[in-house]
């Protein structure tokens, strides 16, 4: 037996070479000349891809025996193949007509193109038009990993074919757990769509879904069509089922419509529109439920976000949301998304500009406040409008200079027809200059600034004594100089930690702040509150946060000390210990309305620690201790153990001391323990869960009494990992929706690799609730046209 190899090039390859050369010449002629100045890299025309027409692509033939005329008809016998740059055809015997491109394959037909392999006992194909037919074909689709068997296949083009009496599966297992049987299946690879007519979805050989018209993707890309239905149940809405339809409108925008049925409330329609372009992006979502069965009212919500670059440093953006009523998110939360705690919906629009040294914007910022009848809230002030300007120049002859100015008109919405405070205008400007001195092992940063504020207030001739305000002056101003000095050092030494070589650091830091007293009792309070004392706040210029309607007088020194143990080989931080305290040289005289001034000469102690004692165990501790009454003001302790994949245990304890009665500028107390777990139970079974339990036993308010003690959130679930292409999940969730009410939800999901998921996806819930959660299905790499090569 002899091996012959004939190469058919003739005029086709010559024409291709002439065309390629011509393209190179024209490309070179049209290339722009390099501009004077910095050199510019240009792509060589010789590196460009030049495609020939299908009928001019040369073909290579190989077989044990070849006979015939290469200019007309050739017969290949024994290990025969016809190979082109865009595909290959193999068989026991191949008859090839060069003039028409027709190929007749007999025995062990095998065709490979773009990673998709088709086999069968015989086939007829035209290599120029890539059309033909195959008897009893088997398919391996490279881009998606899917497989199919059919009685007959008609191939219409490179991208379109029709299969008759088909069994299709996207499961890569030797014995697929799921498959679709259909009378016919039309595949369109350009449109990324498979259409099965009279199709039935089987799982474990049991039919679970039938449809006269079923679509599915043939590549791991977006396509229009119905998504898998989601379903579950909640105590507030009953049985919940939705059937989303996805519109792949264009590469840069799409639309999803979500018809949804809630057994206790009725039918709802939701939608999400996403778009992305050169210099802009955005999303718009909304839902509408007419005539809620429970309330008798129409229920709806919407949210739209957009950001766009306008050129020359200008930009605009908005974030606008709204809901039909206060209880919308408590009654109709999305499955798996605990939106019941949503309190404020933003309504903001902004236009801005930025350059190297300056930034500015003008915006209107309003809110819709969703009230909880068991714990009503005072609505925040609207900013209608706000103008903001910042200039900054760093390392300017060694100096850092900043200038920040704002001008705001504040209006507060009424609460049940009652006015809760004055309205007015506020102008602020704050220029600062600092001179950072940074050297190896130490730093020193002196800083000075002057904060000026001008108010024009509408008091509405009301008596505001109840909030500490009784001065009705229309205009008022305040000028406060602020001076600070920040200094620190870093020492290092060789050490050991648990018998392992380490580098230990010692990092002392001192921060001195001087702010003279200015009487501010006659100024309104719009957007200012007392900041939580923390390691970050200990080095700030003001104990108040927000818009600085109050600037506290200060003559104080903050001392802090941090030590770290770093792995000597990798630099990984194994252990960190920190402590800080303020020392006051004068009493506090500036306060918020109803705030009790500080009289102590020392602040609470701040202590913190983080430790990665092993590669699988991490702990964090942060606490605030009051040395005067020997009580903890705030604390948090957490630990996480992850000995292996799909195995994690996280525990946390959080404590916040209750504020004194009548104090509204401090957060409500908290005393809560949390436990979150992901753990393998037996072979393919995995358990997941979380519980948050409030330990509060002496609530300060009636609203807090509703919460004490109780489970604020509970999650329990099971995951079963079948073979390589399916996972089953069932998850139960119970969570608080208000100070007195709770909601429960139950999720069922069957995830079929290569097809999608039936039921409601709880993965986002588990990712948020269980630190270190991992999916039992590892991500699979995206297939390419190079999955197979012969």
UniProtKB/Swiss-Prot annotation:
It comes from Bordetella bronchiseptica (strain ATCC BAA-588 / NCTC 13252 / RB50). The keyword Hydrolase does not apply. InterPro entries: LipoPS_assembly_LptD, LptD, LptD_2, LptD_C. Keywords: Cell outer membrane, Membrane, Signal. It is found in: Cell outer membrane. GO terms for biological process: Gram-negative-bacterium-type cell outer membrane assembly; lipopolysaccharide transport. Its main location: membrane. HAMAP family: LPS_assembly_LptD. Belongs to the LptD family. This is LPS-assembly protein LptD.
């Amino acid at each position: 037996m002899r091996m012959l190899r004939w190469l058919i090039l003739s005029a086709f390859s010559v024409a291709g070479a002439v065309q390629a050369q011509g393209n190179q010449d024209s490309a070179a002629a049209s290339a722009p000349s390099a501009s004077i100045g910095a050199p510019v890299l240009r792509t060589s025309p010789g590196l460009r891809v030049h495609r020939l027409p299908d009928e001019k692509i040369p073909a290579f033939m190989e077989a044990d025996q070849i006979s015939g005329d290469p200019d007309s008809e050739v017969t290949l016998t024994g290990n025969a193949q016809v190979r082109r740059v865009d595909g290959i055809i193999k068989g026991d015997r191949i008859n090839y007509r060069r003039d028409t491109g027709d190929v007749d394959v007999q025995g062990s037909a095998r065709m490979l193109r773009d990673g998709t392999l088709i086999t069968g006992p015989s086939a007829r194909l035209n290599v120029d038009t890539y059309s033909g037919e195959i008897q009893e074909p088997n398919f391996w689709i490279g881009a998606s990993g899917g497989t199919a068997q059919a009685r007959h296949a008609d191939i219409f083009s490179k991208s379109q074919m029709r299969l008759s009496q088909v069994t299709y599966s996207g499961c890569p297992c030797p014995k697929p757990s799921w498959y679709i049987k259909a009378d016919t299946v039309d595949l369109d690879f350009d449109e990324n769509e498979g259409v099965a007519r009279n199709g039935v979805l089987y799982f474990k050989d049991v039919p679970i879904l039938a449809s006269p018209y079923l679509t599915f993707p043939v590549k791991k890309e977006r396509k229009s069509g119905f998504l898998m239905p989601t379903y579950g149940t909640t105590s507030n809405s009953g049985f919940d089922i939705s059937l989303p339809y996805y519109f792949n409108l264009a590469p840069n925008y799409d639309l999803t419509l979500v018809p949804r049925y809630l057994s206790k409330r009725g039918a709802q329609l939701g939608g999400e529109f996403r778009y992305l372009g050169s210099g802009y992006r955005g999303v718009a979502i909304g839902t509408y439920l007419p005539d809620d069965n429970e309330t008798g009212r129409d229920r709806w919500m919407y949210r739209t976000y957009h950001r766009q670059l306008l050129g020359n440093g200008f930009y605009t953006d908005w974030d606008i949301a709204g809901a039909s009523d206060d209880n919308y998110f408590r009654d109709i939360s999305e499955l798996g998304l605990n939106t019941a705690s949503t309190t404020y919906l933003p309504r903001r629009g902004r236009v801005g500009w930025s350059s190297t040294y300056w930034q500015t914007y003008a915006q209107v910022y309003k809110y819709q406040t969703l009230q909880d009848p068991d714990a009503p809230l005072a609505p925040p002030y609207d900013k209608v409008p706000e103008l903001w300007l910042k200039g900054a120049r760093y390392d300017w002859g060694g100096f850092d200079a900043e200038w920040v100015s704002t001008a705001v008109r504040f209006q507060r919405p009424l609460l049940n027809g009652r006015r809760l405070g004055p309205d007015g205008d506020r102008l602020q400007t704050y220029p600062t200059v600092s001179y950072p001195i940074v050297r190896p092992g130490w730093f020193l940063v002196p800083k000075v600034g002057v904060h000026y504020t001008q108010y024009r207030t509408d008091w509405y001739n009301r008596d505001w004594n109840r909030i500490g305000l009784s001065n009705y002056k229309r205009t008022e101003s305040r000028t406060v100089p602020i001076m600070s000095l920040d200094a620190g050092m870093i020492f290092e030494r060789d050490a050991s930690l648990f018998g392992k070589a380490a580098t230990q650091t010692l990092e002392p830091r001192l921060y001195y702040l001087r702010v003279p007293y200015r009487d501010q009792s006659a100024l309104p309070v719009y957007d200012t509150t007392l900041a939580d004392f923390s390691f970050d706040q200990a080095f700030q210029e003001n104990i108040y946060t927000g818009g600085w309607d109050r600037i506290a007088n200060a003559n104080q020194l903050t001392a802090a000390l941090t030590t770290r143990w770093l792995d000597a080989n990798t630099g990984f931080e194994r252990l960190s210990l920190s402590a800080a305290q303020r020392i006051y040289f004068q009493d506090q005289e500036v306060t918020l309305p109803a705030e009790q001034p500080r009289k102590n000469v020392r602040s609470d102690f701040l202590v913190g620690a983080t430790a990665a004692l092993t590669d699988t165990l991490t702990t964090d501790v942060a606490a605030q201790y009051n040395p005067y009454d020997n009580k903890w003001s705030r604390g948090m302790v957490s630990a996480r153990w992850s000995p292996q994949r799909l195995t994690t245990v996280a525990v946390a304890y959080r404590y916040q001391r209750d504020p004194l009665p009548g104090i509204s500028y401090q957060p409500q107390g908290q005393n809560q323990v949390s436990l979150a777990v992901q753990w393998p139970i037996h072979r393919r079974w995995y358990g997941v869960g979380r519980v948050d339990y409030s330990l509060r036993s002496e609530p300060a308010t009636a609203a807090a009494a509703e919460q004490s003690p109780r489970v604020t959130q509970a999650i329990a679930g099971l995951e079963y990992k079948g073979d390589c292409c399916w996972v089953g999940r069932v998850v139960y969730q119970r969570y608080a929706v208000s100070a007195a009410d709770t909601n429960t939800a139950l999720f069922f999901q069957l995830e079929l690799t290569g097809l999608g998921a039936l039921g409601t996806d709880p993965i986002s819930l588990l990712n948020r609730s269980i630190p270190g959660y991992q999916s039992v299905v590892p991500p699979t790499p995206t297939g390419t046209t190079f999955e197979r090569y012969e």
